[in-house]
Design a protein with these regions (language model features):
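Gly-rich Lys/Arg/Thr-decorated short loops/hinges at beta-loop-alpha junctions or inter-strand turns
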Residues: 126-135, 160-162
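Active-site-adjacent structural elements in folded domains
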Residues: 8-16, 168
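A short acidic, amphipathic alpha-helical/loop segment
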Residues: 13-20, 177-181
């Protein structure tokens, strides 16, 4: 089992499970990021406990924070190797999980597992992966892949085909990607963005960003999911990731995003994004002057967080 840890709870059941796995004779490799702000002391203490239990510990990289949420379980039965890969948008932390909204994908697809294995092999050598086919992995294989996906939508728009980009992040400050989004808007791509915090793009500017909408949802739970959607309809390319679209995430950190191949999961994410776009209680819509406006009271109010909460409890 291999895992990256950024922020963990003070009494972490995740770390206890890793310790138990190592004590049961499993081969456990844990990358602990010691520079997680305000959690340095906690992470040092857990590293010591993990090492004592027989886990192999890697202490991040010299010049890059490892912010990814990646776990890989490798099983060898005879000569056959199988993988279970988990990629998430949120930390392995029970305390923050109570109040943050996040997505987590678990997949047995071998191509994802093999690529995740390459990511860990590079990290174990103090390096970063330079090429990926499936996963989005910064600092080398996230920004450029995202730019290619934006270009693909621009080509569709220019050919008169439906073109769409949807994005949900905590912050948008990466100038290169902002410029790509502006170019896509000018090419006729419809773009919807849910950006909770800092957003350095102003939507609704004629001839620049008139095809872009930006809204921020601030509710009872901290919006923390990162979703990238490229394409209109069910054939859209959908990713979940640990990375915001900030230069610190795309260039100065190790982040991982995963494609969603399962049609049911993809449909669920698309549906949830549409619901968030319809939120008229906690969503504030960015105006062309950069201000955010709450929507006027509706006869049918929709609070997306409450809606998802009710759905989860009805399941």
């Amino acid at each position: 089992s291999k895992m990256t840890l950024y922020r963990v709870a003070t009494n972490s059941k995740i770390v206890e499970a890793l310790i138990e796995a190592a004590e049961n004779g499993k081969d456990v490799v844990v990358l602990v990021e010691l520079r997680a702000r305000f959690d340095e002391e906690n992470n040092i203490e857990w590293s010591r406990r993990l090492e004592e239990a027989g886990c192999r510990i890697i202490y991040g990289l010299d010049n890059l924070k490892v912010h990814s949420k990646l776990c890989l379980i490798t099983r060898k039965i005879g000569n056959a190797i199988s993988y279970i890969t988990q990629v998430g948008t949120g930390n392995y932390n029970e305390k923050t999980a109570e109040i943050y909204t996040d997505y987590s994908l678990m997949t047995a697809r071998s191509e994802i597992g093999m690529e995740a294995s390459r990511v860990f092999n590079a990290l174990c050598m103090g390096q970063t992966i330079k090429h990926t086919e499936y996963l989005l992995v910064s600092p080398h294989c996230l920004q450029n892949h995202v730019a290619d996906l934006i270009d693909r939508e621009m080509e569709k728009a220019k050919a008169g085909q439906p073109a769409y980009i949807a994005l949900k992040v905590n912050s948008l400050t990466d100038k290169y990607l902002i410029d790509k989004l502006i170019a896509a808007s000018q090419a006729g791509v419809k773009i919807d963005m849910i950006v909770r915090g800092i957003c350095c793009l102003i939507a609704g500017i004629p001839k620049k960003t008139e095809n872009i909408t930006v809204r921020s949802i601030v509710g009872r739970y901290l919006e923390h999911t990162r979703i990238y959607i490229f394409g209109a309809g069910n054939d859209a390319a959908v990713y979940i990731a640990s990375a915001d679209w900030m230069t610190r995430n795309t260039i100065r950190r190790v982040e991982v995003g995963a494609p969603i191949y399962d049609n049911d999961i993809k449909a669920r994410i698309l549906s949830m994004f549409r619901t968030m776009m319809q939120d008229n209680v906690k969503a504030r819509i960015q105006q062309p002057d950069g201000s955010y406006k709450k929507q006027s009271a509706s006869s049918s109010p929709l609070n997306a967080q409450e809606y998802f909460y009710a759905q989860a409890y009805a399941a």
